[in-house]
């Protein structure tokens, strides 16, 4: 029996009801791994949807839920929630704009026991103000960091282009990093090639940790196997099974 104070269904049409996004998250905790459930949470709370019909595998969309809404739903269930759901929601972030941003956040942010580098979960597409001089005045414009660790003032910008098309693209990417540095934010650029190569990505993770004033400790003797397992789960073709 479901608690009355935790509405679980949305009316689709006369006599037909669908599980709401928060209830979907809890229901799938019974069949998904923790990692797959976190990925689902990122998609529910993000601005993209997995779409096999799209040439890039996803499409822009409005968030279906939020970490606040899922946590509130879990609280109202009064213990009638799988422990896996309570574990997974701790690592879900609002605002991811793409599957690769989600994967980057999990690779870098998750604890070592799950195969991550343990840097802590970032804010996704966080808004920051970039200073710009206009005569004698300093003005500010809004800017969004793909991944941002606000306490350490460190950002990671993901460049989805495998190769730069022209010099203008190179200039634009360099400008993004320079603009963040002008705001006092240490920034690193990451490409698909970095993510695909274990050695290159390890270097990125250690660089990010250094900027944060952290050390990546090897907490498990099988850490390489844990990291490989996480990669397999993140980049599998059928993520919700």
Region annotations inferred by a language model:
Residues 60-241:
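Surface segments flanking catalytic/ligand-binding clefts of nucleic-acid enzymes
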Residues 1-81, 112, 219-241:
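Short gly/ser-rich loop at a beta-strand->alpha-helix junction or flexible surface loop bordering the NTP-binding
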